[in-house]
Each structure stands twice: as structure tokens, then as C-alpha cells.
Amino acid sequence: YLEEWTAPTKRHTPDAAGNWDATPAAYLRGLGEMQTQHTCILLEDITAACNLTCPTCFADSSPSRAGTVPADRVLANIDQRLARENGRIDVLMLSGGEPTLHPDFEEIVERVLERDVVRVLVNSNGIRIAKDDAFLRFLEKHNRRVEIYLQFDGFRLETHRAHRGADLRRIKADAVRRLSEAGVFTTLTMTASLGVNDDEIGDVVRLALDTPFVGGVSIQPQFGSGRSTTIDPLNRLTHTGVLARLGPQTNGLVTWRDLTALPCSHPHCCSVGYMLRTDKGEWKSLVGIIGHDQLKARLDLVANRINDPELSAQLRRLVKEALLGLLSEQSSLTHPSIAQLFRDVCESCDLGLSTLIRLAGDALIGDTKRFRQLVATRIKRITIKPFMDMHTMLEERLLQCCVHVGTQRGAPDAEHQCAPFCAVQAWAPLSGTKLAELARREHTVPLLSVEA
């Protein structure tokens, strides 16, 4: 089923011309000639340190891991990727460690926003967000282009202790509430583990559906990199295991049938689905409204393509491009093209969402405030992201990966490049080329102190 949703990939410019080295060694010189996908998301690890020591951290971050990447070096890596991506990056993720502890975090964000970077995602544990009013105001100031990926694993004390090593229930609740009130779009990022919190998946999905400006949830099964290397490779939560749990845990509100594979990457790398709240207050999925077969036809993913004489070639192309735009790593509810995408899909596929169509039209002529409010309460994006480790690594997935981590060629003053996320986390020689790991070898400025 997942493999039915593969779409053609986009070409990229190799970091080193003529790099035909074998995988994964090729990535020590950046993206090679065999890579089949460009960069949808560029992830920059701006510090190796964190104010938590999470037992399941794939990056092995902790308060003892000093290493702060100078702002100029972060920007140099981003600029190198911009040059490879024809001057534009759709999604930049700032990560770590805990990126909000970087003493120049605000400067980095503002300098990034001066570039043609459409959206900035901040991967955070939420501690500073829950406690620092000035920082929250900074995020609110930039809420049109800055979004938070908030670690949110569930609601039980045992869940928090297993994944984060501390009781963070109040902090997580405060962070969600404050971000919602500030109008900052947030994705709840859930690390899900068998026997720990795999029975809380439905509750986290419901929180996303019920909370304004929580744009959705990203469910990530625990994988064996970093401090998770002790995970049992034969007894673990899987991609399809998460899909199977959605229906029973939401009483059928969201099921595996509401998601598809992400067409732009390898079909085993991500499932995605949109939930839309109708004018009657009912949640329906984009897939459920359009239908699986019709959606595949609109995407030109089936042999018998649309042959409806009522649909012109131009309209078919418009709908296809809009749907591919939605079903992409580059898309989220803060993307400036979201109004156009949903208007094209809703009008052309006859979804019966009159208010959504009208406000999408208003947004296209400059009235974005009401459309943002509608998106905040009536459109949610659910993704399942099963990252690979050494037990599950597939070369074909690496070659089609579109989530790339900024790296350098073995030294802080070396050439800037990038490599696929899963390879960077799993293979020690490549992990050592992350900007934050290279910065650990140097004298670094002190981090901000924000404790749980």
C-alpha cells in the first residue's frame, strides 16, 4: 500500500562532483552523485548540549556535552545549501541538543529570516518556552515564519521518566498553552515506544485536534541511535504498528486509511495525512473525502490517469501540483502557499468545505489573519516518521532521503555540505562531521541556563 504513492524525485547538485563512493562513505564528502532527491528539510545542529539527559535521545545530548556552533558558521552552512538549491530552502530546522539554549539563538533566527528560507522549525523540549516570557514574545513576533517542533511523548509520569528522565508534564502543558495563546504553530513530536507509550498515540492525536495552533502531530517510533542503541531490534514499535494503533485509540476518528506514504521521499520513510474540520464541526480526512483511488489518479500515480473530459489538462496539472505540495516534507500549515494549495484542492475536488475555500481565497488577496485562525483550528497534519538505525538501514532509503543534516568535511574550517539524517545519527564517522560535534573540539561560549 505504501509503495503505491511514490512520485518522481527532484534532482540535486552534488556537494562534490564525481563523488561515486559507496554508501555511507560517500556522505563524508556530502551528497553524492547517486543521491536521487534534493533537500526538502535542512537540519542544523547548533549545539550539542541540552538541559535534559533523555534516556532515548538519538543525538546523545546532555548538559555535559559542551559545543556551541558560532552563528557565522551556521549561516555559512545554510548559504552553501541555498547555493545548491537554486537560492531557496523551504524548511530549515534548528536542532541540537536544545537549540533554544544557544546564546545567539535569536540572532541566528533573524539572520536566517533575511534569506530566502520559507520557514524555520525549532526542535525544542519546551522548557525555555514554558518559562521565558521574553523568548515567547520573540517567537510570537516571528510566528508567520517560525514554527515549533515540541517534544511531547504523552501524559503519564512513567512516559516522561522513560523518555525524558524527568517529570515534565507541567512544563509540556504550559508550553503547549503558551504557544497556542501566542499564535505560534506547533507540531507535537512524539517518541513512541513499545510497552512505554504506544497506548498514548490516540490521546496525543486528540490533543492536536483539540488545540488551536497545534498544527498536528509527528509520531516517531523509537530507533536505535544515540542512547537508544539498546533497543531490541526484533521487538519494537514499527511504522505499520503506529498506523494500526490510530483507529482503535481514536475510536475510528483517525485510521491508517486517512494517511498515505509521502510521495516525495521513499514510501517507507513517512506517512502523512490531513484532517479537516467541516463547517458542521466533523473531522474528515483529505484522503477519506477524495478517496484513495481518486487521489492516486489526481497525483498521476496510476496507469489509467484522469480521463474526465470536464477537467482540462491545465486543471489536472493544477490539482496534481497542489496535492503534491500538500503531501511533501516541505509543507506544513505555516507555509505561505498553504492557502493556494487548499483552495486549488478544495475547489477542484469538490470537498464541500465552503468556509475553507472562501477564506483561502481571502488569504490570497491579502486577508491572512482569518485564514490563519481557520487553519489553526480546522486543519491538522498527522505524520509518522520511522527513522532508521543500523538494524533497519536501507541504502535505497538513504539515496532517496530529503531530510539532510548540515555537516563539514572533518574540520571546523572545512567545506560545508550535508548528509541524510538517518546516516548521520547511526554511523559514528559521519556523526563526527555535524557542526555541533566539530564545535565541541573548540572553545565555545557558555550556553544559556534554563533548567526544568
Language-model segments: which ranges?
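Short alpha-helical segments and helix-capping/turn motifs at coil-helix boundaries
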Residues: 27-28, 41, 133-134, 201-204, ...
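Short, solvent-exposed loop/turn segments at secondary-structure junctions
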Residues: 51, 155, 193-195, 224, ...
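Short loop/turn segments at strand-loop or loop-helix junctions that form parts
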Residues: 46, 58-59, 150-155, 220-222, ...
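Radical SAM/AdoMet-radical enzyme domain recognition
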Residues: 75-94, 102-221
